[in-house]
């Protein structure tokens, strides 16, 4: 990364699994994740809070901005990366596909609630099934998203304003 970025905008970095080396296409080693965070800080990038994303996007200045997102709510995020982000209060969005919550390898609703209590942490909808929705009809897509919304309301007490399309 360089301090001389000409283009204005917000860089979005997406992560999935942490220290789950048997999934190389979606995994990052913690030593590399920590290098990412340190490099971002060293180059004076600003971590964007999701609540301010729209105003940051509409009000582009010369500051270099980054939004971190984490997909799928794998337990490895909670165990490995969450303590680092929490300690540094680095803002991010955790996108949750709700059907898998509590399943083997995934976070629980209690863990997600714990994270959601932090002002810098946001929980987003990643659908219910995490299916490749392009292959579904409008009714199936609507039903899938509505199931996730119901899970959010039941377990967190609100419907998230953030949505990340599975495989999108």
Feature names for model-found ranges:
Residues 8, 13-19, 63-66, 75-78, ...:
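Metal-dependent polysaccharide deacetylase catalytic core of the NodB/CE4 family, i.e.
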């Amino acid at each position: 990364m360089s301090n001389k970025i000409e283009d204005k905008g917000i860089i979005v970095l997406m992560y999935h699994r942490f220290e789950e080396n048997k999934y190389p296409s979606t995994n990052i080693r913690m030593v590399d994740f920590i290098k990412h965070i340190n490099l971002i800080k060293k180059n004076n990038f600003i971590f964007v809070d999701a609540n301010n994303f729209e105003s940051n996007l509409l009000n582009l200045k010369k500051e270099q901005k980054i939004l971190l997102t984490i997909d799928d709510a794998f337990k490895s995020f909670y165990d490995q990366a969450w303590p680092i982000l929490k300690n540094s209060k680095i803002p991010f969005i955790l996108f949750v596909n709700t059907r898998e919550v509590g399943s083997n390898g995934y976070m629980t609703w209690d863990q997600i609630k714990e994270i959601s209590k932090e002002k810098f942490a946001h929980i987003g909808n990643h659908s219910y099934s995490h299916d490749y929705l392009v292959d579904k009809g409008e009714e199936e897509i609507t039903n899938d998203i509505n199931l996730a919304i119901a899970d959010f309301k039941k377990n967190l007490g609100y419907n998230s304003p953030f949505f990340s399309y599975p495989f999108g």
